[in-house]
A protein has these predicted regions:
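Conserved glycine-rich Rossmann-like NAD(P)H-binding loop of the short-chain dehydrogenase/reductase
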Residues: 14-28
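Active-site helix of classical SDR
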Residues: 106, 142
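The beta1-alpha1 cofactor-binding region of Rossmann-like NAD(H)/NADP(H)-dependent oxidoreductases
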Residues: 23-24, 44-56, 88
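Substrate-binding pocket helix/loop in short-chain dehydrogenase/reductase
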Residues: 82-83, 87-92
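Canonical Rossmann dinucleotide-binding motif of NAD(H)/NADP(H)-dependent dehydrogenases/reductases
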Residues: 1-17
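Residue(s) in the substrate-gating loop at a strand-loop-helix junction
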Residues: 126
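SDR active-site lid
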Residues: 159-218
């Protein structure tokens, strides 16, 4: 979904900073954007590390030569398993990326948007934010947290002309399974679901979201 957003933003004339814990993946995205004639930069960033995200916020303005006006918090990982079989290390790993990563992103950019006088934040959650699929406890909790955070910030920051929205897509083919820690039996089920029951694509999600943002419907 992150790459799809970057490509769609480039199509609309946007300059993009692609931040990823996997720098090579970010650089691949930047190459695609540059082929479209877009101004794009790649940065290594572990969203679970607040210092990394603060550095991203400061450096992005320098790279772009203008303030950042849109932030998309998209990093996420998956983990399935029975609640009593998941370790606290598992919980910390998922929470640090899926929830704290979004908190860090918002915390780094909201003060800048207040100073600028406007801005937009799109947090990517999941339908798991409001459904309770069994054996997905840690994932469900993190996505519910992203939903709650986003709705709270939307109400709190509206008076500052800062728009905060949250996406809760259903099944969308992404790399979350490949990059997650999902036991084999769950991985096969997830792959089957994505292959056979995916209701949309990451490109469609990005296009629809940005269309609505451009029309002032978010």
């Amino acid at each position: 979904i992150g790459r799809s957003f970057a490509i769609e933003l480039a199509k609309r004339g946007g300059s993009v900073v692609c931040a990823d814990i996997n720098l090579e993946a970010a650089e691949e995205t930047v190459t695609l954007l540059e082929q479209q004639g877009a101004k794009a930069f790649a940065m290594h960033c572990d969203v679970g590390n607040p210092e990394h995200v603060t550095h991203l916020a400061e450096t992005a303005e320098i790279l772009l030569s203008h303030p950042v006006t849109l932030v998309i918090n998209n990093a996420g990982v998956g983990l399935g398993g029975k609640f009593d079989e998941l370790s606290l290390e598992d919980w910390n790993w998922v929470m640090n990326i899926n929830l704290w990563g979004v908190i860090h992103g918002c915390h780094a950019f909201v003060p800048k948007f207040k100073q600028l006088g406007y801005g937009a934040i799109i947090n990517v959650a999941s339908a798991a934010s409001y459904t309770a699929a069994p054996e997905m406890s840690v994932y469900n909790v993190t996505k519910a947290g992203v939903l709650a955070l986003s709705e709270t910030l939307s109400a709190e920051l509206r008076k500052f002309n800062i728009k905060v929205n949250v996406l809760c897509p259903t099944l969308v083919p992404t790399n979350i399974i490949k990059n997650g820690r999902i036991p084999g039996r769950y991985s096969k089920l997830a792959d089957h679901a994505l292959m056979n029951y995916a209701m949309t694509t990451s490109d469609a999600v990005a296009t629809l979201t940005l269309n609505r943002l451009d029309r002032g419907q978010l």
